[in-house]
Amino acid sequence: MVPDSDEARLFLASCGLELYVGNGDETPAPLDIVQQMSSAYVEPVVAVPRDTPNPVEELGRQWHGVAARQRLAAEDGRFLILLAGPGTSGRGWLCVKDSVGRDLPARLLEGNGSLEFIALSMDGKRICATSEEDDEYWVVYEEVPS
């Protein structure tokens, strides 16, 4: 998905995300962040068992809570996102604003077939992601090493 394309704009709009042109000033390469998040040392800040009632809804609540506490979104609400799927790191960051403000994993699951995504602050320093593990959904928070 080309970041500034009609395809990207329409898909993101269907998920309640507004696409903006332009990324953060010092944005790390997507592949670097994907590798950091794929490390064997990554641990969740929240793990939601799949047998929890409404686990995807709970994952959304937890992700939004962590993202808010860590000030992932800029003052104007924008953040960067990498969506799950083949070629993720090659597509680049998409600069978005969440016009709904809740249930982002569920909205992406419905539109993309996956609830996994990596979100990055506009300054490129804070990561908040979701992940599907064996019998849990994870919310992962990491800071980008300087």
Where are these regions (language model features)?
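Structured alpha/beta or helical-core interaction and ligand-binding surfaces enriched in interleaved
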Residues: 1-136, 141-146
